[in-house]
From Swiss-Prot:
The keyword Amino-acid biosynthesis belongs to this UniProt entry's keyword annotation: no
Transmembrane segment boundaries: none
Family to which this protein belongs: Belongs to the peptidase S14 family.
CDD domains for this protein: S14_ClpP_2 (cd07017)
Name of the protein in its database record: ATP-dependent Clp protease proteolytic subunit
PROSITE patterns cross-referenced by the UniProt entry: CLP_PROTEASE_HIS (PS00382), CLP_PROTEASE_SER (PS00381)
Stored Gene3D superfamilies: 2-enoyl-CoA Hydratase, Chain A, domain 1
Length: 196
């Protein structure tokens, strides 16, 4: 169930679903697993807000366990494509593909709430049963290329070396807000809409 808010206007009362109301304030909610339908919705909202006014920041709130690499990279590419700066605010968890998205916000405008967590790891993939050996080799090569691409993005976003990212992402690597700030994935920790 999506909450509805009622707003008083000069023409009377108007009701909005909460996400439409937040969009009026240039706020986009990226919550739940990253998948194609969710990514398409986020991309459409980014493009809409950029077309409305490319000089005003867009606020992307992130709380996701991660998900599809291709869907996540489509969001990142759109964030980089539009003219408006995208501020990212991590609440809850930014894990896996969520870290790629959250750390790709405009430099100096990547935030995290005090009790939120970050997690990086290597991408996951596989082939189903009955797969031919040559198809398995193709899938393994693609997975390695994907890992290299994601590690380069994380290195660029954090200031760490690709070698350091590769080492840390070998297994699930969890970070608190303070650790994420020290690592370089965010620029500041927020508390009550104030920056620490």
């Amino acid at each position: 169930m999506i909450p509805v808010v009622i707003e008083q206007t000069s023409r009377g009362e108007r009701s909005y679903d909460i996400y439409s109301r937040l969009l009026k304030d240039r706020i986009i909610m990226l919550t739940g697993p990253v998948e194609d339908n969710m990514a398409n919705s986020i991309i459409a909202q980014l493009l809409f807000l950029d077309a409305q006014d490319p000089t005003k920041d867009i606020y992307l709130y992130v709380n996701t366990p991660g998900g599809s690499v291709s869907a996540g990279l489509a969001i990142v590419d759109t964030m980089n494509f539009i003219k408006a700066d995208v501020q990212t605010i991590v609440m809850g968890t930014a894990a896996s593909m969520g870290t790629i998205i959250a750390s790709s916000g405009a430099k100096g405008k990547r935030f995290m709430l005090p009790n939120a967590e970050y997690m990086i790891h290597q991408p996951m993939g596989g082939t189903g049963g009955g797969t031919q050996q040559t198809d398995m080799a193709i899938a393994a090569e693609h997975l390695l290329k994907t890992r290299n691409k994601l590690e380069k993005i994380l290195a660029d976003n954090s200031g760490k070396t690709v070698k350091q990212i590769h080492k840390d992402a070998e297994r699930d690597y969890w970070m608190s807000a303070e650790e994420t700030l020290a690592y370089g994935f965010i620029d500041q920790i927020m508390d009550n809409t104030k920056v620490k």
